[in-house]
Amino acid sequence: MSYNCSSGNFSSCCFGSYLRYPVSTYNLFYPSNAIYSPNTCQLGSSLYNGCQETYCEPTSCQTSCTLARSYQTSCYCPKNSIFCSPRQTNYIRSLGCGNTGLGSLGCGSTGFQSLDCGSSFYHPTTFSSRNFQATCY
C-alpha cells in the first residue's frame, strides 16, 4: 500500500481502500472526539510515517459516517474490512482513554471498549477478530 500526505495535517491521504481525513475536517462534525495517531502508524503489516492528527475509516463507510452527527450503530461496514467489526467501525487512536493503540469513537453507547493502555499499536486484524462490544471507560 502507499500513501500521499502533505506535511503536518493531511489534506487527504489514501492507502489501499482507506481514506485518511484531517482533524480540522473531522472537528467540524465531532469536536469533542478528535482522534490522533502517532508519527508512525501501523496499518496491517506496513508502517506509515509522518501520520499526525488524523483518523481513518474505510471508504465504504465514508458517506454514512462522515455525514452523521454522531457515530451510531447504523453506520455499517463490510464484514471483511480490517478496521470494521460486523456491526461497527473502528478507528485508529493513540492518546485518549489512556495511551491506547486501536480504539473507537463514541465511547459510551456506540463505542467498543478501549484496548489495554500501552505505547504500541495493535495489529488491526487482531483487534477486529476479537469481540469488543463493551463501552469505553
UniProtKB/Swiss-Prot annotation:
Keyword DNA-binding among record annotations: no
Keyword Translocase part of the UniProt annotation: no
Any Gene Ontology CC annotation: intermediate filament
Key words of the record: Keratin
Pfam families referenced in this protein's UniProt entry, alphabetically: PMG
Source domain of life: Eukaryota
Family matches, as InterPro entries: KRTAP_PMG
Function as written in the Swiss-Prot or TrEMBL entry: In the hair cortex, hair keratin intermediate filaments are embedded in an interfilamentous matrix, consisting of hair keratin-associated proteins (KRTAP), which are essential for the formation of a rigid and resistant hair shaft through their extensive disulfide bond cross-linking with abundant cysteine residues of hair keratins. The matrix proteins include the high-sulfur and high-glycine-tyrosine keratins.
Family: Belongs to the PMG family.
Subunit structure comment from the entry: Interacts with hair keratins.
Protein name: Keratin-associated protein 15-1
Organism: Homo sapiens (Human)
Gene (name only): KRTAP15-1
